[in-house]
Design a protein with these regions (language model features):
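Active-site core segments that coordinate phosphate-bearing ligands/cofactors
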Residues: 1-48, 57-84, 93-206
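Conserved redox-cofactor binding core of oxidoreductases
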Residues: 51
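Catalytic DNA-binding helix-loop module of base-excision-repair DNA glycosylases/AP lyases
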Residues: 54
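Core-facing hydrophobic residues within beta-strands of well-ordered domains
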Residues: 88-89
Length: 206
């Protein structure tokens, strides 16, 4: 469910690198997070993970509601499977679901908000933009999101899974609940635009 190939941008290659090159850090780490899940934990103390993050970046099989232990053992991360995935997520929640607890006292104090303020489970940044297709005329099934930043992502939702070689996904409920997500993109889109602008004759005057 990753277009036939794992990208080095995904999290399991990063964890394998950490294990092979910084083993003491890998062994000591209590948890491994995607940024969105880290921010939820930092605000609430809740270790729950988002379907969006773990499905798109960590190989969680959302349509089967499980991790694939064989995959982790095959690539050399058997420790995570042996631990029943305690360090990468055992409670997986849909984006927008309130975390088990609201803001902690420390987080509330730091943000100037009431203790217990609800905090929703998050999404990967591009997917937070892509979910806007739900509000467009004719809805998510008829529109493709093109989200730009440092990278660029194209995302489209389908009612049934679509397997396309080289296209990430299909991911179930990773962006729009109940729909399958397929995505592609260009990691260096922002840098490419900067380079293009640098070629302009008036670039030094800008």
């Amino acid at each position: 469910y990753v277009g036939g190939k794992i990208s080095p941008e995904m999290e399991t290659p990063k964890l394998l690198w950490l294990k092979e090159h910084r083993r003491e850090i890998f062994d000591r780490a209590g948890q491994f997070f995607d940024l969105a899940d880290f921010l939820t934990w930092r605000a609430t103390g809740d270790l729950a993970r988002s379907i969006c993050t773990v499905t798109c970046k960590w190989t969680w099989l959302a349509h089967e509601n499980r991790w694939d232990a064989d995959y982790f053992r095959t690539i050399g991360l058997s420790e995570l499977a042996d631990e029943n995935f305690a360090r990468i997520g055992q409670r997986i929640l849909a984006p927008g679901t309130p975390s088990a607890s609201g803001l902690t006292e420390q987080a509330a104090r730091e943000m100037g908000l009431p203790v217990g303020t609800p905090v929703a489970v998050g999404l990967v940044d591009a997917h937070a933009g892509g979910i806007g297709t739900v509000g467009v005329e004719e809805g998510a099934l008829s529109n493709l999101a093109y989200v730009f930043g440092t990278s660029s992502c194209t995302m489209t939702s389908t009612a049934e899974p679509a397997f396309v070689p080289g296209v990430w996904g299909p991911y179930y409920s990773a962006m729009v609940p109940g729909l399958w997500l397929s995505e592609g993109g260009q990691s260096a889109a922002g840098a490419a635009i900067d380079q293009l602008l640098a070629f302009h004759p008036a670039a030094e005057e800008a």
